[in-house]
Design a protein with these regions (language model features):
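Surface-exposed, active-site-proximal loop segments in enzymatic domains
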Residues: 54-63, 96-117, 141-156, 188-200, ...
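Cellulosome-associated attachment modules in secreted, modular CAZymes
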Residues: 7-18, 540-636
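N-terminal carbohydrate-binding accessory modules
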Residues: 19-89
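Acidic/histidine-rich helix-loop elements
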Residues: 46-74, 103-111, 152, 269-295
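Active-site region of glycoside hydrolase catalytic domains
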Residues: 158-289, 301-321, 343-344
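Aromatic-rich peripheral "rim/lid" segments of glycoside hydrolase catalytic domains that contact
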Residues: 326-409
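An active-site-proximal structural segment forming one wall of the substrate-binding cleft
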Residues: 70-89, 100, 106-139, 146-182, ...
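Extracellular ligand-binding interfaces
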Residues: 411-513, 520-536
Length: 636
C-alpha cells in the first residue's frame, strides 16, 4: 500500500484561492479566444462519470456506474480540492449510452432523469465556484464503431443529437463558464485500412465533420441566448493532435464560438511508453533518437499555425505523463509542455485517473494519478509536478494538501443495528473472510426471493459485497447484484427484489431458473458477518437496541456457507488479454475497449479476460483486473 513517508510533500500553499460563485461573476459576450484566454489550466475527472456498467438498467443508481471502474464516487470536496489546487477548469468526461432509452412516442432517444440530475449535480459543484466546466459525451458505443458507414452515421446522429438536445435544455441558462464538447475521441475500431490511433482518412474525416456539424446545429438551435454564445469543442479523428488530423477538421459555417479539441500525451516515449524505446528522463531522447524538447516545440508550433489559419482556438483536452517514479523529470516535462502551450495560446486540461505509481507493479503507462480521491490529498509523486504546472501557467494562489492514506472506519457489532423482524440466514460473530470475487453459497437464501423481502448483508470492506444468482438458462448463469444505494448504511448493504429482477431482465433470464444464491466479495476482499432476509415493509432499525432477537431461519441442518461446485478450466494467466505473458495496464485498456464494443476477442483472450470464471465478460471482470493491476492500495 502507498504510505506517507517522511519524504511526502508538505502542504504547498501560496495563499487562499478566492471563493466566488458563477452568479457573482457572470461570463457573457466573450468570443472563443476570449473564453480560452481565461482558462488557465484544467483537470479531468477521469474514469468516473465516463465509466460504464453495461449490466445495469438505463435508470440504475448513478453510483453503480461512476464506481464501476474502481474509483470512489466523486464528491463536492474533491472538486473543492481541485479548485484550491489552482485549477480553474474542470472537464467532466461523461458516458451516456448506458443511461438512454428509446422513446417511441417521440421517436427519439431520451436520457434517464436520474442520470441527468446526477451529471448536473457534479457540474454545479465546479460551476458554482466560478470554474470553467467542460461537459462531453465520452465512451459511446454508437460513436466508436468498427467501420464508419451510412447506417452507423444515422444511428450516431440520432443518439448524439438526442443527448445534446436534452443537455442543452437542462443547462440552457448557464453562462460561458460551461463549455460543451461534442465527442471525445471518435474513431474506427476495426477498419484494417484506417488505423484506430492513426491520422484518419478522408472517409473518417468527413464522417466526424458531419457529426460535429450535427452537434453544433443542435446546441445553437436550442434557442437560449446562452447556448447561442456557448463555446463548443470539436474533435478530429480520435482527437489526435497531428498536423494532418487537426487540419482535416472543418469549422461549420455560422457556428459561432467553437474551439478545436485535441489530446496529446507527448512525447509518447517519455509520457506513456513502457517498451525498449521508452526513456522516462526529461529532457532526453526516445530509443528512436527523437529529441523530446524538439517534439514538443514542433507540436505546439504546428497547432498554433493551424489555429491561426482556421481562426479558432485549440484546447488540449487531455495531457499527462504517467508516473514512472520520475518526479523531477515529470516536473521538468510539465514546465516545458505548459510553457510551449501557453506561448501558443492553448489551455491544457490534465488527465487524472487516480492511478498512482506502484513499486510492486513496476512501470505503468496509465498511472495518471494526481489527486488521491479517497482523502482528497495529493499523491506524493505528483506534488512537485503540480507545483511546476501552477508556477508555469502563472497561478500564484494554490494549496496542495499533503498525502494522507485512507483509513476505513473500524467494524463493530455495536455499530450495526439488526431489526427484530429480520430473519437470520447466516451469522459469524468474528466474520467470514472472502477474497476478491469469491462467491460462497448461503443456504435457504433463495426461499426469500420475492416482493415481500429484501436482503441485508453485514460486512466490513472498502467495497461492499454483491449477491450472486446462479441459473442454468439465459446468457450466462452467474449474475452479480450490487447493493441498493438508497437503503444501505455503514457496514450493512441492502439488496431489493427489484434490484434482482432488473439484473435478470437485462440478461434475459428469470427468477424461476435460479438454482442457488451466493454472497460474494466484489472488487476487493471482504469480511461477511451476517446475511438476513428483511421484510420489505421493515422499519430501519433505530439507534436503540432491538427488544427481541432476530428470527433464526429454522432448518434441520446447520446454517452453513459452502463452496460453489462449478469445475474450473485449464489454468491460464488471468488478465493477460494482450497475450504478452504479463498483466499490465495495457490489459485493462484493451478489456475496456472490448466492453464498449470497440475490440473483438479471440477465444483465448476471452478466457483470460474472464477474471471470475463465470464464462462471461462484463464490468466485474474489468474492475477485478484494474484492481489487480493498480488500485489495490486501500486494501493492503
Amino acid at each position: 500500500a502507498a504510505v506517507c513517508a517522511v519524504s511526502c510533500a508538505a502542504v504547498v500553499s501560496n495563499g487562499n484561492p478566492e471563493e466566488f460563485t458563477a452568479e457573482a461573476a457572470t461570463l457573457t459576450g466573450k468570443d472563443a479566444f476570449g473564453i480560452t484566454s481565461e482558462m488557465t489550466i484544467g483537470w479531468n475527472l477521469g474514469n468516473s462519470l465516463d465509466a460504464s456498467n453495461t449490466s445495469l438498467s438505463y435508470d440504475a443508481a448513478p453510483k453503480k456506474s461512476v464506481t464501476a471502474w474502481g474509483n470512489p464516487e466523486p464528491t463536492k470536496e474533491l472538486i473543492d480540492t481541485v479548485h484550491n489546487a489552482g485549477f480553474n477548469t474542470v472537464r467532466i468526461p461523461t458516458t451516456w449510452f448506458t443511461h438512454i432509452y428509446f422513446d417511441e412516442a417521440t421517436n427519439t432517444y431520451k436520457v434517464s432523469d436520474v442520470w441527468m440530475n446526477y451529471v448536473k449535480k457534479v457540474v454545479d459543484w465546479a460551476y458554482d465556484q466560478g470554474m470553467f466546466v467542460i461537459l462531453n459525451v465520452h465512451h459511446e458505443d454508437f460513436i466508436n464503431v468498427a467501420v464508419f458507414t451510412d447506417d452507423t452515421y444515422a444511428t450516431a446522429k440520432q443518439k448524439l443529437t438526442g443527448i445534446w438536445s436534452q443537455v442543452s435544455e437542462v443547462f440552457a441558462d448557464y453562462d460561458q463558464h460551461l463549455i460543451f464538447e461534442g465527442m471525445n475521441e471518435p474513431r474506427e475500431t476495426g477498419n484494417s485500412s484506417n488505423s484506430e490511433w492513426g491520422d484518419g482518412d478522408q472517409n473518417s474525416w468527413n464522417y466526424i465533420n458531419k457529426l460535429n456539424k450535427d452537434f453544433v446545429d443542435t446546441i445553437r438551435g436550442q434557442g437560449s441566448a446562452e447556448n447561442k454564445e456557448r463555446l463548443l469543442m470539436l474533435p478530429g479523428y480520435h482527437a489526435g493532435a497531428s498536423e494532418k488530423t487537426v487540419s482535416a477538421i472543418e469549422i461549420p459555417e455560422n457556428s459561432g464560438n467553437v474551439a478545436i479539441s485535441t489530446h496529446a500525451y507527448t512525447p509518447y516515449f517519455f509520457a506513456m511508453a513502457t517498451d525498449e524505446y521508452a526513456n522516462h528522463s526529461f529532457p532526453g531522447k526516445s530509443g528512436y533518437g527523437g529529441d523530446y524538447e524538439t517534439e514538443l516545440e514542433t507540436q505546439f508550433n504546428t497547432l498554433k499555425s493551424i489555429s491561426d489559419k482556421k481562426g479558432v482556438p485549440i484546447i488540449m483536452g487531455e495531457f499527462s505523463a504517467s508516473d514512472f517514479n520520475n518526479t523531477a523529470d515529470r516536473a521538468r516535462w510539465a514546465q516545458s509542455y505548459l510553457s510551449k502551450a501557453k506561448a501558443a495560446g492553448i489551455p491544457c486540461v490534465l488527465w487524472d485517473n487516480n492511478v498512482a505509481y506502484n513499486a510492486e507493479k513496476g512501470d505503468d503507462g496509465e498511472a495518471h494519478g494526481y489527486i488521491y480521491r479517497m482523502t482528497n490529498t495529493i499523491y506524493p509523486n505528483s506534488s512537485d509536478v503540480l507545483k511546476s504546472m501552477m508556477d508555469t501557467v502563472g497561478v500564484t494562489d494554490y494549496t496542495l494538501p499533503e498525502y494522507k492514506e485512507y483509513e476505513a472506519p473500524a467494524f463493530s457489532w455495536d455499530n450495526v443495528k439488526i431489526g427484530s423482524d429480520w430473519i437470520e440466514l447466516y451469522k459469524n460473530q468474528s466474520g467470514l473472510e472472502l477474497e476478491a470475487w469469491k462467491p460462497e453459497k448461503v443456504d435457504n437464501m433463495k426461499k426469500y426471493l420475492s416482493e415481500d423481502y429484501m436482503y441485508a448483508v453485514v460486512y466490513d470492506s472498502t467495497v461492499p459485497p454483491a449477491i450472486v444468482m446462479q441459473t442454468s438458462t439465459g446468457t450466462g448463469g452467474w449474475y452479480y447484484t450490487l447493493l441498493n444505494d438508497d437503503k444501505s448504511v455503514d457496514f450493512t448493504a441492502f439488496y431489493t427484489y427489484d434490484d434482482f429482477m432488473s439484473v435478470l431482465k437485462n440478461n434475459n433470464d428469470s427468477a424461476s431458473a435460479i438454482s442457488d444464491m451466493y454472497v460474494s466479495a466484489h472488487s476487493g476482499d471482504s469480511k461477511i458477518y451476517g446475511v438476513y432476509a428483511v421484510p420489505a415493509n421493515s422499519q430501519q432499525p433505530t439507534t436503540e437496541e432491538p427488544t427481541t432477537e432476530p428470527v433464526t431461519e429454522p432448518t434441520t441442518e446447520p446454517t452453513t456457507v459452502t463452496e460453489p461446485t462449478d469445475p474450473t478450466g485449464e489454468a491460464v494467466l488471468k488478465g493477460d488479454v494482450t497475450l504478452d505473458n504479463t498483466v499490465t495496464i495495457a490489459d485493462v485498456v484493451l478489456l475496456q475497449k472490448y466492453l464498449i464494443k470497440s475490440e473483438a476477442f479471440t477465444d483465448e483472450q476471452f478466457d483470460r479476460a474472464d477474471m471470475n470464471d463465470d464464462s462471461r465478460i462484463n464490468i466485474f471482470d474489468a474492475v477485478a483486473l484494474r484492481r489487480y493491476v493498480a488500485l489495490d492500495e486501500s486494501a493492503e
